[in-house]
Regions:
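Helix-turn-helix
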Residues: 136
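Structural motif
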Residues: 121, 142-143
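Conserved GNAT acetyl-CoA-binding A-motif
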Residues: 118-131
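A generic structural signal for beta-strand entry/edge sites
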Residues: 87-89, 125, 162
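Extreme N-terminal starter segment of soluble prokaryotic enzymes
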Residues: 1-4
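C-terminal "cap" of GNAT-fold acetyltransferases
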Residues: 129-133, 143, 150-173
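Acetyl-CoA-dependent GNAT
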Residues: 7-12, 18-89, 93, 98-99, ...
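Conserved acetyl-CoA-binding loop-helix of GNAT-fold acetyltransferases
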Residues: 97, 103-116, 141-142
Length: 173
């Protein structure tokens, strides 16, 4: 497995053709009085071919700094950053690992790549509007993310059930 910064030489519109964005969710976290409470709320997340093509076009748009995990020239994970700082934070816009490749350290490796990118760009934290599924929040928490004390209002409004999380990556001067 190799983590690479995406460019036109290693990524095309067809690069996500076989990507499996599938997740069966049973439990989600909800905020209640400032605390995360786990509640039963089953749903399934699944990308069809149209959604995968749209994601590939987003990656190729030039609006994001994107790292992908490649296994035998196939994309098995992606993480997209909005390159402009927001109050000293870089925002993770998208972060997924293909279903069959989860629990292999790929997400951790992708996150480390964007931590290094954030440091190069002078950020002190990473910010993410996270799907509230138990698995997703447990992963982000294990990676050092905590509920943001300064959530970005547009993300809260657009995704009211997402949890706004951030991870400090260096000490402020």
């Amino acid at each position: 497995m190799e983590i690479m910064l995406v460019d036109k030489h290693n990524f095309t519109r067809d690069s996500l053709k076989d990507f499996q964005r599938y997740q069966e969710v049973k439990n989600v976290y909800r905020l209640h009085d400032g605390k995360m409470i786990l509640v039963y709320n089953p749903f399934t997340e699944d990308w069809d071919a149209t959604r995968r093509l749209q994601k590939a076009e987003d990656i190729l748009s030039g609006k994001y700094v994107t790292y992908c995990a490649f296994e035998e020239n196939c994309v098995v994970g992606e993480i997209m950053l909005i390159p402009q700082l927001n109050k000293g934070r870089l925002i993770i816009d998208s972060f997924h690992v293909s279903t069959d490749y989860r629990r292999r350290g790929i997400g951790r490796s992708l996150l480390e790549a964007v931590r290094q990118e954030a440091l190069k760009r002078g950020a002190h934290a990473l910010y993410a509007s996270c799907c509230s599924s138990e698995e997703t929040i447990n992963f982000y928490s294990a990676m050092g993310f905590r509920l943001s004390s300064d959530p970005i209002s547009s993300y809260v409004e657009d995704e009211p059930y997402d949890l706004q999380m951030e991870c400090i990556i260096c000490v402020l001067n």
